[in-house]
Amino acid sequence: MSDWNPSLYLHFSAERSRPAVELLARVPLENVEYVADLGCGPGNSTALLHQRWPAARITGIDSSPAMIAEARSALPDCQFVEADIRNWQPEQALDLIFANASLQWLPDHYELFPHLVSLLNPQGVLAVQMPDNWLEPTHVLMREVAWEQNYPDRGREPLAGVHAYYDILSEAGCEVDIWRITYYHQMPSHQAIIDWVTATGLRPWLQDLTESEQQLFLTRYHQMLEEQYPLQENGQILLAFPRLFIVARRTE
């Protein structure tokens, strides 16, 4: 599991794209020229940006070679760069930085967010959506299984929180719109939950394990999911998935 798997990620493309659609709907810009899609993945969010601003110069950034290859194939009219978000520098100031479900993987948000604001034009917008599920059973159980099986903690850090992000971005000279939504995804089985998180949150826990170690981890994880996520009357499972949204417009 040395690289991200675009096919696995796109297995739940409708569910993953919905927050991007809702984030984009709140971006208060009509005409833009320069746009960056940070953590663009296979290009599903980039496609939304291109659809809204077909004449804009849109650059997708991702550290995964497989994701970049998939995005380039799907969107030949956009530019894609394989790079670390923290180190990438645009050639010109940006009108919009769009980051859908990517910045949660990066540390030091108290430094990262002001840095991103500094890349914007005056009145430019930083639009961010991040999964806020560190305390959800899906992610708590990952840590518990790792502890049981004597593996080091490989999960991402919890988000800084609504009040912290508001202060960070206000102090960086932005007007801030921030909100949190919990989606309830209908899952046909506990295995479907595993399929979902294997493409994202579970990936760091599995990537350095042998095949047999992965199987032991997933078997135990499946058992614990069954305890935490009961079936509905129709046999479906409701997977709660909170997400944090931020639209920050530069005013200084």
Swiss-Prot record:
Described purpose of this protein according to its UniProt entry: Catalyzes the S-adenosylmethionine monomethyl esterification of trans-aconitate.
Name of the gene encoding the protein in the UniProt record: tam
Catalysed transformations (reactions): trans-aconitate + S-adenosyl-L-methionine = (E)-3-(methoxycarbonyl)pent-2-enedioate + S-adenosyl-L-homocysteine
Cellular localisation: Cytoplasm
Family from the record: Belongs to the methyltransferase superfamily. Tam family.
Keyword ATP-binding in record: no
Organism of this sequence: Shigella flexneri serotype 5b (strain 8401)
Gene Ontology molecular function: trans-aconitate 2-methyltransferase activity
Keywords: Cytoplasm, Methyltransferase, S-adenosyl-L-methionine, Transferase
Protein name: Trans-aconitate 2-methyltransferase
Matching CDD domains: AdoMet_MTases (cd02440)
Lineage: Bacteria, Pseudomonadati, Pseudomonadota, Gammaproteobacteria, Enterobacterales
UniProt record, GO biological process: methylation
Alphabetical list of InterPro entries matching this protein: Methyltransf_25, SAM-dependent_MTases_sf, Trans-aconitate_MeTrfase, Trans_acon_MeTrfase_C
EC number assigned by the record: 2.1.1.144
One annotated Gene Ontology cellular component of this protein: cytoplasm
Pfam family, one: Methyltransf_25
